[in-house]
Design a protein with these regions (language model features):
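Terminal accessory carbohydrate-recognition/targeting modules of carbohydrate-active enzymes
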Residues: 7-10, 18-301, 657-768
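Substrate-binding groove/exosite segments of carbohydrate-active enzymes
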Residues: 288-400, 427, 437, 502, ...
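Bacterial N-terminal signal peptides that target proteins for export
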Residues: 1-7
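Active-site-proximal structural scaffolding
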Residues: 26, 141, 191, 225, ...
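Non-catalytic carbohydrate-binding regions of carbohydrate-active enzymes
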Residues: 24-46, 463-505, 534-692, 696-702, ...
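Aromatic-rich carbohydrate-recognition surfaces in CAZymes
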Residues: 251-253, 257, 282-283, 336-422, ...
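The feature captures the catalytic groove of carbohydrate-active enzymes
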Residues: 242-278, 372-376, 410-477, 509-515, ...
Length: 768
């Protein structure tokens, strides 16, 4: 029997041992994917809410396989490896097949020299067989040290030398472990240095090979691989030799071989790499990331996956930063700044307590401009500055930025036309050039005039404040008049168009056309503007229409309308654009619907275990292992998830609509499972416009109580402060007290803490 055939047979025997396929077709008592896609309501989301204790990750986990594939030659999604804020970034393919491999299509940018990894005596590309390769894992669940295992057995006898009386011989098949991280030293950051370790964790004898594009023009001397121009491509430990234009290392069980790969070639060979270098640099890199995450608001919930996700999303965004520029992605067509998406990511960092960093990151956004979207950007930039001022309280920064933000303010004040009081027509959205009077643009601009008034008062800019107040009132009247004249009442609920005065047809199903999909993607700005008065009949028209006409899937924003989507399929989700819809759910106090989006994103909007998102992902699976998604990773997708987590724990509300929050809501949308007996919810030093807030919630259901320690903000006292204890189904709160003082508590577990100040100890007495 030929060696190749023997190896193939041995591989076939390993399928059951290593396969990790997602049995999405075997879900019981669930609508089919076709039924769910065809429904105008969120079938899976509604079913999740009906489960005991409400939505959960486990409910969504196996309905579909996760995002896994991209429209690149390397097919498996890429993982960016970078030092914090480094300008040079490496690309690891998530099946372990190589580093800095070329994408091929126009969507992907080439970075560094492609390095391909091969294993076994047949030099098979690592990770080629999906049933043999594990999904990548981060160290401790979140640290950016990737680990991937791959089964590829070696023959256990000399070819041809087979004894006549051969006996059956079962043996452990070779399993290789690949580990990689970006070195965070100054040198590593400058050169995109990736350190790699191959280990044989099972089996007897293993072989690893490293291949470059320049296999016939390379030299390998003193463990340094150079190209024909004498540039250093990589360094190795003493395990490696060169054969047939590739580096090779033989491994016995428990042995390792290490490499240092340069994305940007160094100027000289002053950097030293040897057998101990991988571990030495690994320890320093781990400490770098621990120190960075220690600066953030600290959250601990009784769901390790959530704890890993928020830490890793912060790490990812530090890796996507190029200096002070929050790019949308890296090493693809989205390696650039966008005002709306960049703002989402920066404001998420601000919400997690990176105040000084966020001020620096905001400057490139304030300087950004794109023709045809000037008024859209003006509203975004003003709202960004308002939030930065509210959280940091840094008036000096606001004054320093005044030439930038006042230019945007004057654009809104001066460009409204006399005829209808609205801003001039501009692009329907970034991807659709059709000029319209955009409700998205006008609503956002009006809200910025509303919310900037407290800031102008704080800066004592009285003449400008007077001008803004007058304009905001006139603008609000004109905008409501335009919207009410444009609403389509033939649908239930009535349809609110983005294109005012243009007779935009109702989109139903929303994703049946491209324009409908973009209507769905951008209408969050309208929701966030709260243009309709509280309690008015129109207040919930938009959110109700989204939910009843196919705008939501597993709590995530849907899109579609492409007859022949090459990477996407006809139906997909663009979760990151649902941030304002999610915040509106909190405003309307619908925690279970909010959790549908939270867990839908975690289970089906991100890669499994590595938490990497793209701009959008298909709903139809490619195969049982995964679905396509577009140009990952994505800083706004990361920002979306950590913003949801932050707000389900700590949320501010402007109930009186005066442009400034006056209500603080704590733990208003936590999972009921998080307060099962013995579990704890904790958030420490979360920045708000009132100051930092912390709480620790300990469930002692077995003793009939829940204990809560709260540290209320000290910078400014909210007019109203509420804390909610969301108990598992079947449990009720009997009373709440602080010491001997009774605290008013509602049936849903909401306690009124408005009269309290400083640190507070609460006891909720509970029963079944």
């Amino acid at each position: 029997m030929k060696l190749g055939v023997l190896i193939f047979m041995m591989l076939a025997l390993a399928i059951g041992e290593t396969s990790k396929l997602f049995a999405y077709e075997e879900q019981q008592k669930l609508p089919t994917l076709k039924e769910a896609i065809g429904s105008k309501v969120d079938l899976y989301g509604n079913l999740a809410i009906s489960q005991k204790n409400g939505p959960s990750y486990e409910f969504f986990e196996n309905i579909l396989p996760p995002p896994r594939y991209v429209n690149a030659d390397f097919r498996y999604y890429p993982m960016v490896l970078s030092a914090p804020q480094a300008r040079v970034k490496a690309r690891l393919v998530s099946n372990g097949s190589g580093i800095n491999l070329r994408g091929g299509s126009r969507s992907w940018r080439d970075v560094g020299l492609p390095i391909t990894f091969r294993v076994g005596p047949d030099e098979f590309i690592f990770g080629s067989l999906p049933e043999r390769v594990t999904s990548p894992q981060w160290l401790e669940g979140w640290l950016p040290v990737a680990s991937i295992d791959y089964v590829h057995p070696s023959p256990f006898q000399t070819e041809g030398g087979v004894p006549i009386d051969q006996k059956a011989n079962s043996r452990e098949m070779e399993t290789y472990r690949f580990e990689a991280f970006a070195d965070t030293s100054n040198f590593g950051s400058e050169h995109g240095l990736v350190m790699v370790r191959f280990s044989l964790i099972k089996g007897i004898q293993g072989k690893v090979a490293v291949q470059t594009e320049e296999s016939k023009k390379i030299t390998f001397t003193n463990n340094i691989l150079k190209n024909s121009e004498n540039q250093t491509l990589l360094m190795t430990d003493a395990k490696w030799i060169i054969q047939r234009g590739m580096l090779h290392a033989n491994l016995k069980k428990g042995e390792s071989a290490t490499l240092a790969i340069f994305t940007k070639t160094p100027e000289n060979d002053s950097f030293k790499f040897d057998t101990g270098s991988f571990d030495k640099h690994l320890l320093k890199t781990i400490q770098t990331w621990r120190n960075l995450i220690a600066q953030a608001t600290q959250v601990e919930v009784p769901e390790p996956r959530v704890n890993h996700a928020w830490k890793n999303h912060l790490v990812q965004n530090f890796m996507l930063l190029q200096g002070d520029k929050m790019n949308y992605s890296a090493s693809n067509q989205y390696e650039q700044l966008y005002s709306a998406e960049g703002s989402e990511a920066v404001l998420a960092m601000l919400a997690w307590n990176y105040k000084e960093l966020s001020k620096n990151l905001m400057i490139p956004i304030l300087d950004f401009s794109r023709k045809g979207l000037e008024h859209h950007q003006a509203g975004i930039k003003l709202l960004d500055v308002i939030r930065m001022w509210a959280i940091t309280g840094d008036k000096d920064w606001v004054v320093a930025m005044q030439p930038r933000w006042e230019k945007e303010l004057q654009l809104i004040l001066n460009n409204r036309n006399q005829q209808n009081g609205l801003l001039p027509k501009e692009r329907y959205c970034g991807d659709i050039s059709t000029p319209v009077h955009s409700l998205c643009v006008d609503a956002k601009a009006w809200r910025s005039l509303k919310d900037i008034q407290p800031l102008l008062a704080d800066l004592k800019l009285e003449p400008l404040l007077t001008q803004v107040r007058k304009a905001e009132k006139e603008y609000g009247v004109a905008l409501l008049k335009a919207v009410r004249a444009s609403i389509r009442t033939e649908t239930d609920p009535p349809f609110i168009p983005i294109a005012l005065f243009d007779k935009e047809e109702p989109h139903s199903p929303i994703t049946s056309t491209r324009i409908g999909s973009y209507w769905n993607i951008i209408n969050g700005f309208v929701l966030a503007s709260r243009i309709f008065p509280k309690g008015s009949k129109e207040e919930n028209y938009l959110s109700d229409y989204i939910e009843k006409h196919g705008g939501i899937f597993m709590g995530m924003t849907r899109s579609g309308g492409t007859a022949h989507g090459f990477w996407t399929g006809a139906e997909r989700v663009n979760p990151l654009y649902g941030s304002r819809y999610s915040m509106d759910l909190l405003r309307r106090d619908q925690p279970d619907k909010f959790l549908v989006g939270f867990y839908g994103m975690l289970a089906q909007g991100l890669t499994r275990d590595t938490f990497i998102g793209g701009e959008g992902c298909t709903l139809d699976p490619v195969d049982a292992g995964g679905r396509f998604f577009y140009c990952p990773p994505n800083s706004a997708a990361n920002g979306f998830f950590i913003t949801m987590l932050r707000n389900l724990l700590v949320h501010e509300l402007d109930s009186d609509d005066d442009g400034e929050p006056e209500t603080l809501q704590l733990a208003f949308a936590t999972s009921r499972r998080w307060l099962e007996d013995g579990k704890t919810i904790s958030i420490q030093k979360a920045p708000t416009s009132f100051g930092a807030v912390s709480f620790n919630m300990k469930s002692k259901l077995g003793e009939g109580r829940v204990e809560v320690h709260v540290e209320l903000p000290e910078k400014k006292t909210p007019a109203k402060t509420f804390l909610r204890v969301r108990l598992p189904d079947g449990w009720k709160i009997q009373q709440c007290k602080s010491g001997e003082e009774k605290v008013t508590v509602l049936a849903d577990g909401t306690a009124d803490l408005s009269k309290f100040r400083g640190a507070l100890q609460l006891e909720f007495l509970v029963s079944k």
